[in-house]
């Protein structure tokens, strides 16, 4: 069994330049509301829907704040019926609490006019038509009345007014009848439930697609790695690489295909660096296939796809690499071997600096106790990052990113209900990853300069103009 203990390390702060990341905006929003979380958990979030009261504020009768009836009301109705004014906020929320649409054209309703919710434009149109007894040219096209075209066909507009229930017999302004209020409240609640249900289904579908693509494209996931590291596999025990002798043995057995004749005679550090490159190239290929499975990615401009992968693959690689690590070392050779952290630290300069920062990051990241479903969404969010330099269709990419981050947030809340701050803590890791990749790219350039280690063409293309 390999020791699995992972010490809890303090979170590192966000760097100033990382605050420009759209993902980091979520972090700032989360941190801004953390103070309210404990209070909000105890509040009744069900609430109740209230509706505004509309008053006639013109001159003459009713200018004192009372509400008058339509001057076209039947003779049997009183000429001036007053309704008591209900102070806003006493038993109903402000008028802005619910955005009600005009039943005729869909514009924002200004009140309850002639028996229905209507905007000022349609209210005035109906009043003029009735008062002046206007007759419009007949239209058989059943025109669709919308805000942008409501003035084009007056016949169909007036017909729509009548069809939705506008009547000169109804009061012109005033409080919404209780029956209408109850009906509208029921409609709003039903609509909200339906839309929430549809949205939840869409989000679950997105999360499922990303998770399935993750499991399909990556051989070593966290579940497998943790089982191997815990020594719970029924196969042969891990071969531990802890010195030069065991390294040579592993190169002849576990890594024989990777360590070719061309590099077999080079120094140990260069051979290890070569093996790391081979793993990286394979993972980049798998990440490319994973990215294609993210809804919307394959439809992006090819240049944008390349840019997102170029800047995101190493952040994703170091994220997934954490699953194979514990405080003592990491899995190699598809989980058949284990190389100790101490052995890697004792390599000569600058090779000894290659893996230690990754171990430090992994200890903090593993302390979050994410599972593969969480990690899959986080990796997808890393790839679809709208602040990468040189992107063409930024708006579309940011919408993709926003959807994935929203799914990630909801998934974490469901998967880790007891960890209220997990989402902002995870987003903070974005800053750590960017710094980690920057330092790694700089170290690779040093290794290229100070040794005879060659860089794989694919990785060379990724590093070019990167930092």
Curated annotation (Swiss-Prot):
A GO molecular-function descriptor: RNA polymerase II-specific DNA-binding transcription factor binding
GO cellular component: nucleus
SMART domains found in the cross-reference section: HOLI, ZnF_C4
Positions of the DNA-binding region: 99-173
Modification comment: Ubiquitinated by E3 ubiquitin-protein ligase HUWE1; leading to proteasomal degradation.
Residue numbers spanned by region Required for heterodimerization with RXRA: 304-433
Protein name: Peroxisome proliferator-activated receptor alpha
Lineage, broadest ranks: Eukaryota, Metazoa, Chordata, Craniata, Vertebrata
């Amino acid at each position: 069994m390999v020791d699995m203990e992972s010490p809890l390390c303090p979170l590192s702060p966000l760097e100033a330049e990382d605050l420009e990341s759209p993902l980091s905006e979520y972090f700032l929003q989360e941190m801004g509301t953390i103070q309210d979380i404990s209070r909000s958990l105890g509040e009744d979030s069900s609430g109740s829907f209230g509706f505004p009261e509309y008053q006639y504020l013109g001159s003459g009768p009713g200018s004192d704040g009372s509400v008058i009836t339509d001057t076209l009301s039947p003779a049997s109705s009183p000429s001036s019926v007053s309704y008591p004014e209900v102070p806003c906020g006493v038993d109903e929320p402000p008028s802005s609490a619910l955005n009600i649409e005009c039943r005729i054209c869909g514009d924002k309703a200004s009140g309850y006019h002639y028996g229905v919710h209507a905007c000022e434009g349609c209210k005035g149109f109906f009043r003029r038509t009735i008062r002046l007894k206007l007759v419009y040219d007949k239209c058989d096209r059943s025109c669709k009345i919308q805000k942008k075209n409501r003035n084009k066909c007056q016949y169909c507009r007036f017909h729509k007014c009548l069809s939705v229930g506008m009547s000169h017999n109804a009061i012109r302004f005033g409080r919404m009848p209780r029956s209408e209020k109850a009906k509208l409240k029921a409609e709003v609640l039903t609509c909200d439930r339906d839309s929430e249900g549809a949205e939840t289904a869409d989000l679950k579908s997105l999360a499922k697609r990303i998770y399935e693509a993750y499991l399909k494209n990556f051989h070593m996931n966290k579940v497998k790695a943790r089982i191997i590291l815990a020594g719970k596999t029924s196969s042969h025990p891990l071969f531990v690489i802890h010195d030069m002798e065991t390294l040579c043995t592993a190169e002849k057995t576990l890594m024989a295909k990777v360590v070719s004749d061309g590099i077999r005679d080079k120094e140990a550090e260069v051979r290890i660096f070569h093996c790391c490159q081979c793993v990286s190239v394979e993972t980049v290929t798998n990440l490319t296939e994973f990215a294609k499975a993210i809804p919307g990615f394959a439809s992006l401009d090819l240049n944008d796809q390349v840019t997102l992968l170029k800047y995101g693959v190493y952040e994703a690689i170091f994220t997934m690499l954490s699953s194979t690590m514990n405080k003592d070392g990491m899995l190699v050779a598809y989980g058949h071997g284990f190389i100790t952290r101490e052995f890697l630290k004792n390599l000569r300069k600058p090779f000894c600096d290659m893996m230690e920062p990754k171990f430090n990051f992994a200890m903090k990241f593993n302390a979050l106790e994410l599972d593969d479903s969480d990690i899959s969404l986080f990796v997808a969010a890393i790839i679809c990052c709208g602040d990468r330099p040189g992107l063409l269709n930024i708006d579309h990419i940011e919408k993709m990113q926003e959807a994935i981050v929203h799914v990630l947030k909801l998934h974490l809340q469901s998967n880790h209900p007891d960890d209220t701050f997990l989402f902002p803590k995870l987003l903070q890791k974005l800053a750590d990853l960017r710094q980690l990749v920057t330092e790694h790219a700089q170290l690779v350039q040093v290794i290229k300069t100070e040794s005879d280690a060659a860089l794989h063409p694919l990785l060379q293309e990724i590093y070019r103009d990167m930092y």
